[in-house]
């Protein structure tokens, strides 16, 4: 089921809720106090900027943004051009190299071209303090991103959800698998990738599911954004 609805239509009201204002106010105050918060303010909502609701074909759920300098830019697992691919993304590239014929690991870790093709790269939590993983958990972001997933679940059909690791799988518990395709595997982090992420073939499976619906498959070779 396609939709003419936009993100603004389905989650606009959510942004007026008190908890959402409190979350934004907390993050703004932390920045004001001189703390380093990732990603930069202009990039916090990039997942929605690059992938409109009607265009979502695949969802890859992450946890919270990378907390090192110049890494996070609002897309889960992705880093800015010029920054080395972090370990989880390296394992995603390893899996792609065995799963997708002709895939060669790129020299960068920017996944913006995936987002532009309809891959919603959504973190559960949208900000983090520099060097402090999970520091912005339980602020309210989780409530907001639950609403995002609920909006996809209710307003779309045939979306492929890639849920890697217990956190993403719990987050995606309520996705209706009669309406959508839910693929589960361990997280690509070096701690768990060998337990079944490597060899999961989720990227080719996602494309098969898209083609079966008459949709264009994803070109999983990330292209650098045209500046």
Swiss-Prot record:
Keywords: Cytoplasm, DNA damage, DNA repair, Hydrolase
Catalytic-site annotation from UniProt: 64 (proton acceptor)
PROSITE patterns in the cross-refs: U_DNA_GLYCOSYLASE
InterPro entries per UniProt: UDG_fam1, Ura-DNA_Glyclase_AS, Uracil-DNA_glycosylase-like, Uracil-DNA_glycosylase-like_sf
Catalytic activity: Hydrolyzes single-stranded DNA or mismatched double-stranded DNA and polynucleotides, releasing free uracil
GO molecular function, one term: uracil DNA N-glycosylase activity
Protein name: Uracil-DNA glycosylase
Organism for this UniProt entry: Serratia proteamaculans (strain 568)
Upper classification of the organism: Bacteria, Pseudomonadati, Pseudomonadota, Gammaproteobacteria, Enterobacterales
Gene: ung
């Amino acid at each position: 089921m396609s939709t003419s609805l936009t993100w603004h239509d389905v989650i606009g009201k959510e942004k007026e809720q008190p908890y959402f204002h409190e979350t934004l106010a907390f993050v703004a105050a932390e920045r004001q106090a001189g703390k380093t918060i990732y990603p930069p303010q202009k990039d916090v909502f990039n997942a929605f900027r690059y992938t409109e609701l009607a265009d979502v074909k695949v969802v890859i759920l992450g946890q919270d943004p990378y907390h090192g300098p110049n890494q996070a830019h609002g897309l889960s697992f992705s880093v800015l051009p010029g920054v080395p691919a972090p370990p989880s993304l390296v394992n995603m590239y390893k899996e792609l190299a065995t799963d997708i014929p002709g895939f060669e690991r790129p020299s960068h870790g920017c996944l913006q071209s995936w987002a532009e093709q309809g891959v919603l790269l959504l973190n559960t939590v949208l900000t983090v303090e520099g060097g402090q993983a999970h520091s912005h958990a339980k602020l309210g972001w989780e409530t907001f991103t639950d609403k995002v997933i609920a909006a996809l679940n209710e307003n779309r059909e045939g979306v492929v959800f890639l849920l890697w690791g217990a956190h993403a799988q719990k987050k995606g518990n309520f996705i209706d698998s009669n309406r959508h395709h839910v693929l589960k595997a361990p997280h690509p982090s070096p701690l768990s990738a060998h337990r079944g992420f490597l060899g999961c073939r989720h990227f080719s499976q996602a494309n098969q599911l898209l083609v079966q619906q008459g949709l264009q498959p994803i070109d999983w070779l990330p292209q650098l954004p045209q500046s």
